[in-house]
Amino acid sequence: MWYIIVIIIIIIILNLFIIILLTLKILDDIQELYPNPPIVPPPTSPPIVPLPTPPPTPTPSPPSPTPPPTPIPPTPTPTPPPTPIPPTPTPTPPPSPIPPTPTPSPPPSPIPPTPTPSPPPSPIPPTPTPSPPPSPSPLGEPMYYPSNIDTNEALINFLRPLCATDRTRATYAVPWNCNGIFHCNYFSIPFYILSCHNNAYSFVNDGCIDFNSSDCPLYPLNVL
C-alpha cells in the first residue's frame, strides 16, 4: 500500500508545480500587455487623473486531485476441503468351518453279464464244380502258346501265321486273362476274335459270362 501513497504525493506535487508555472506565465503576459508608464512629473495645471485599476485576473482553481485507484482485493485462497476420514473397516467375520466331506461309499460291484452264446457259423455253400470243357467238336482243337506272351496283341501276332498254315488240330486259343477267344476258322469265318471286355469267356457257354462263374481260369491256357 505504501507505493500507492507515494504515487499520490508525486501527482499532487506535479499539479502544484504546473499551477505555479501557469501563474507565472499569466503574470508575464499581463506585464507585457500593460507596461509601467514612465514617471512624468505631474503638470501643475491639470489635475492628475488616476489610472483605472485593471480588474484582477481570476485565478484558475486548481484541478481536483485524481482519486487513488481502488486497490484490488486479493483473491482469497480456496480453503482445501477437509480430508475425508477413512471409514473404519468392518472386521471380517471368521470363515465358517468347512464340514468334512463324507467319504463316498464304494459303488457296488457290477454283476458280469451272462455271455450270450454265439450262434453257430452258417455253413458255406459248396462251390459248384465247373463242368468239364465241351468236346472239341464245336470248338476244334486248342492252340497252346508260350508263357511269355502276356498281351492280346502279342497273341494275335503269334497265332496269325499259325492260322495261315494247314494245321487242322490248331483251331482256337484263349488269352491268359480269359477276356476272349481267337478262332482260326469259326463256321467259315477266318481268324474270328470274340472279346470279353468286362467279364470272361466260358467253355461251357461258349460265350462271355461273369468272371466268377467262368470255367476258363481252371484250365492252363499257355502251356506249349
Curated annotation (Swiss-Prot):
Pfam families membership: DUF5478
Region listing for Disordered, in residue ranges: 44-145
Protein name: Uncharacterized 24.1 kDa protein in LEF4-P33 intergenic region
Classification of source organism: Viruses, Viruses incertae sedis, Naldaviricetes, Lefavirales, Baculoviridae
Annotated source species: Autographa californica nuclear polyhedrosis virus
Comp. bias regions, Pro residues: 44-139
